[in-house]
A protein has these predicted regions:
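Catalytic phosphate/metal-binding cores of nucleic-acid and nucleotide-processing enzymes, i.e., regions
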Residues: 1-66
Length: 66
């Protein structure tokens, strides 16, 4: 995935699942997109559990963000 384009929800899912490689910033952006769009709560259960863990750890923000 090129850094010059906006990350799509598809890209975010692929990065979260490890199909696409991503650095720490890209992983954080991917999970934030999944939370912000609500996909984290409508995909397989582990997405929601991981999103909750990342929110509780302060890695990403809950939606809506301040």
């Amino acid at each position: 995935m090129k850094d010059t384009k906006k990350m799509t929800t598809f890209d975010a899912v692929m990065i979260a699942e490890g199909v696409y490689p991503g650095d720490t910033d890209q992983m954080q952006e991917a999970w934030q997109i999944l939370v912000d769009t609500g996909l984290a709560w409508s995909l397989q259960g582990w997405f929601g559990r991981e999103a909750t863990r990342l929110i509780e750890a302060g890695v990403i923000q809950p939606f809506p963000r301040p």
